[in-house]
């Protein structure tokens, strides 16, 4: 429980490799994570070579910590094995996998797998930071990873021994996230309360201190015209995930 409640993102890492035994335990935990009807629609690709980590740092918008961390994991929604199973049984697959609910299933399983990897890594004293920008240059990432049709890179994860103690970001009030019985849309007061707390955090933290609050950050991030990952629609079509509904 202490590990779960003390999570923080690490972006500076020691020049120290991760022991093979520990990496194997992380991957075992990923495979043991919950999934949909045991179809196991994820794959995790381990990138350790320095040159390749530098390449992924570049593809993910110049995030230097990807090159610095000794291990970069790429989590993929993977329906290729399912395609092989259907092909073996003489069953058509493309019209099924292109329905949007399958993409949601794959994204759900990737999230569960990555969360499992984070907790397992941190239980060994390692630090992590998830990387959403693996989709920024999606076609190059697919080429670098040799991904076939029906496999989509969803998230990356830096893993290594921490070289910093950045502290934790304050979270939203529990009442704004966890509800009893039904959703509560009356959140303005809670968001105002959180804005005040977050503004103090941003102003007083020892690194990258600035003036701002949470609602301002959220609105700025999603300011129109929003097109954070422009390659994604075409990439999903190429990989077989294109809804017909």
Task: Please state what every model-predicted region is.
Residues 1-245:
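Acidic, surface-exposed loops and disordered segments
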